[in-house]
Amino acid sequence: MKIQLIAVGTKMPKWVEEGFQEYRRRFPHDMPLELVEISAGKRGKNADIARILQKEGEAMLAAVPKGNRIVTLDIPGKKWDTPQLAEQLEAWKLDGRDVSILIGGPEGLAPACKAAADQSWSLSALTLPHPLVRIVMAESLYRAWSITANHPYHRE
């Protein structure tokens, strides 16, 4: 199973790239983690936010390979602790499809992305900076994998 993070935003600071790559490298070959960056729409004083969200959503959905399970990161989504995320990872593997996880921009996700989702996940009740979410996602997914593989990374 391949896990694909599709995130709005490009040209992240070096610390974000290094943090993400640190965890991406650790994934096993049979479960690679891939990052697809979508250009954020230009936001300004008189920006049409609804139109920007629509364009970002179209680009995100176009990046999802046909047949993939779509999981959105959204505040009202399911809240999983680490063992529950490990259970989700196992369920996704058994489903036989690759997984695309959509991370919206500053205004969140387009309605079309939410409508296309098979599942919605709330990473935290906190508002997190979008660059940091990439690292938190990579680490959380790696930790969940480590539980399923009985790897010593996760400790109770």
Swiss-Prot record:
SUPFAM superfamilies: alpha/beta knot. Its main location: cytoplasm. InterPro entries: Alpha/beta_knot_MTases, RlmH-like, tRNA_m1G_MTases_N. It comes from the Bacteria. GO terms for molecular function: rRNA (pseudouridine-N3-)-methyltransferase activity. Keywords: Cytoplasm, Methyltransferase, rRNA processing, S-adenosyl-L-methionine, Transferase. It is found in: Cytoplasm. Its EC number is 2.1.1.177. S-adenosyl-L-methionine binds at L73, G104, L123, S124, A125, L126, T127, L128. One of its GO terms (cellular component) is cytoplasm. It catalyses: pseudouridine(1915) in 23S rRNA + S-adenosyl-L-methionine = N(3)-methylpseudouridine(1915) in 23S rRNA + S-adenosyl-L-homocysteine + H(+). Specifically methylates the pseudouridine at position 1915 (m3Psi1915) in 23S rRNA. NCBIfam families: PRK00103.1-1, PRK00103.1-4, tRNA_RlmH_YbeA. Belongs to the RNA methyltransferase RlmH family. Homodimer. This is Ribosomal RNA large subunit methyltransferase H. It comes from Vibrio parahaemolyticus serotype O3:K6 (strain RIMD 2210633). The gene is rlmH.
